[in-house]
A protein has these predicted regions:
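Secreted/luminal cysteine- and crosslink-motif detector
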Residues: 15-16, 351, 443, 460
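Short, polar loop/linker segments at the starts of domains and inter-domain junctions
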Residues: 57-66, 422-429
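Low-complexity, glycine/alanine/valine/leucine- and proline-rich hydrophobic stretches
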Residues: 403-483
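The N-terminal extracellular segments of secreted preproproteins, especially immediately downstream
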Residues: 13-14, 201, 441
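A common structural junction motif
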Residues: 217-224, 476-485
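Soluble acyl-CoA-dependent acyltransferase catalytic core bearing the H(X)4D motif
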Residues: 38-42, 49-60, 73-74, 78-413
Length: 485
């Protein structure tokens, strides 16, 4: 692992502190993962059904809102959780598979929609339907390797892919007639284990997934069902208006002709996943520099800085081409008519979209880009959400649009480590593993269970010949020449 520090000249120029103290401060670390092949044996696969009666019979259906049915939600979100061998004798003797399966079956009584399947109606809209022999898919596997053989477990590694189950020859983005939750438990020779999950985004957003996961983990740990808050389905709260009333342009969904060099640069070779650890001090100073006029959030400043660094590293042309930055905004607290019920676990996110020309990103100031990001975030209101629902109803976009776009996803607002203690302690790592299938996506992750200082990990995919430039721009901070950052 190589530590990247701001140059003493740049750092001193705007921080106003001594060169000596900064030279010892690892504000940005470039993280490296071990290239490995994990050999596993799948021992068995079986459905996990709700352990008690549920309010649905074969043939019943459940409504999904247009927020659940957005084209970007028609995916499975893969995550991996690593648990080290238990230190105490009582925990080490707990049967992992039995506890995880029994507790999941208990939780599925309250979260019964997850035991169904998705299908399309005549107009192409998704719904949940219930049939015989459905349930959640559980996969039990083992490996002769130990967790120590997997390299640094704090850095997302594409080599962990065998630990998250996929069907042979599975079609990309397939969600129809699939189990809505797929869980693979892999037992390692050292006594540790991993839990690889694929959860259908149509059923819940990130906060909804954490609610489900928290209930599962708490039930496993306590040995009795715990589902607080009581889960609430009620997707009809987001019914479209009749007729649909679209009040915003919703450029986040629109197809824009890519008249730039961006797509060719990104896709001409297989992208490489890179991760960087950014300290809380780096984020704080970046936020201070980014808001001379406006009050911004740390995310506003970070998103602006990453976007600018990405565009500069890729040397996008022409300079007058307009680029888009999209990111999800949680709209739960913006809903008042009516407010959401506690326990609602469906999708309540809107896609915010900031736009700026290449020239403005490359030659402008960090404060200008931050302001654009902030305005896009604040533009998400209750009416914006209702307009999004109506836009999807009227247009029903069929494909993801990547033209001129970078998407940043923030996982730091999820209590992903705190929610995942099944009785063996918090996971040593919790999060995604491989971003290379989507090279126009950047993910900001919490640094890990051991970090208590606000450190984040930024993961992004880049062409190999752009990595050094991106690393340089990401680390650069100089108030005397704001166009440098």
């Amino acid at each position: 692992m190589s530590k990247l520090k701001l140059s003493s000249t740049n750092a001193t120029a705007w921080c106003g502190i001594s060169q000596h103290s900064l030279m010892d401060l690892p504000w940005v670390q470039e993280l490296h993962f071990t290239h490995l092949k994990i050999a596993i044996t799948i021992d068995r696969m079986f459905p996990v059904m709700p352990s008690g009666p549920i309010p649905a019979q074969p043939g019943d259906t459940l409504y999904l809102s247009n927020l659940d049915d957005m084209i970007g939600a028609r995916v499975f979100t893969p995550t991996i959780y690593f648990y080290e061998p238990a230190a105490d004798m009582n925990s080490s003797q707990k049967p992992v598979m039995k506890i995880l399966c029994d507790s999941l079956a208990e939780v599925l009584v309250a979260y019964y929609p997850l035991s169904g399947r998705l299908r399309e109606t005549k107009n192409g809209k998704l719904e949940v339907f219930f049939g015989l022999n459905q349930g959640v898919l559980m996969v039990e596997a083992h490996s002769k390797m130990a967790l120590a053989d997997l390299g640094d477990l704090t850095v997302p590694n594409p080599g962990w892919e065998p630990l998250i189950f996929k069907f042979p020859d599975e079609e990309p983005y397939k969600v129809l007639d699939m189990p809505l939750v797929i869980a693979q438990v892999t037992l390692f020779s050292c006594g540790g284990f991993s839990l690889g999950l694929r959860l259908c985004h149509c059923i819940c957003d990130g906060l909804g997934a954490m609610q489900l996961f928290r209930a599962w983990a708490a039930t496993a740990k306590a040995g009795t069902k715990i589902a607080k808050p009581e889960p609430c389905w009620e997707r009809e709260i987001f019914l479209p208006r009749n007729p649909p009333l679209v009040k915003f342009p919703h450029v986040e969904f629109m197809s824009i002709e890519d008249g730039s060099s961006l797509t060719m640069t990104l896709w001409q070779t297989k992208p490489v996943q890179k991760c960087y650890r950014l300290s809380q001090e780096f984020q704080s100073h970046l936020k201070t520099l980014a808001q001379p006029d406006d009050v911004c959030t740390t995310f506003d400043a970070m998103a602006a800085h990453i976007w600018r660094s990405w565009v500069k590293a890729l040397d996008v042309r022409p300079l007058d081409y307009e680029l888009r930055l999209t990111f999800s905004v949680n709209a739960r607290q913006k809903l008042h008519n009516p407010p959401l019920k506690e326990g609602f676990y469906g999708n309540v996110v809107c896609v915010a979209c900031a736009t700026s020309t290449v020239s403005e990103l490359v030659n402008g100031q960090i404060s200008d880009t931050t302001r654009v990001v902030r305005e896009a975030r604040l533009n998400v209101s209750e009416e914006y959400l209702r307009s999004t629902v109506d836009y999807i109803e009227a247009v029903r976009p069929k494909r993801l649009e990547f033209g001129g776009k970078l998407t940043i996803t923030q996982w730091t607002r999820f209590s992903i480590y705190e929610s995942a203690d099944f009785g063996w302690g918090r996971p040593v790592y919790a999060g995604p593993i491989d971003l290379t299938p989507t090279p126009q996506v950047c993910v900001i992750l919490p640094a890990g269970k051991a970090d208590q200082h606000g450190t984040v990990v930024v993961c992004i995919c880049l062409p190999e010949d752009a990595i050094d430039k991106f690393t340089e721009y990401l680390c650069m901070m100089d108030s005397s020449n704001a166009s440098h950052i």
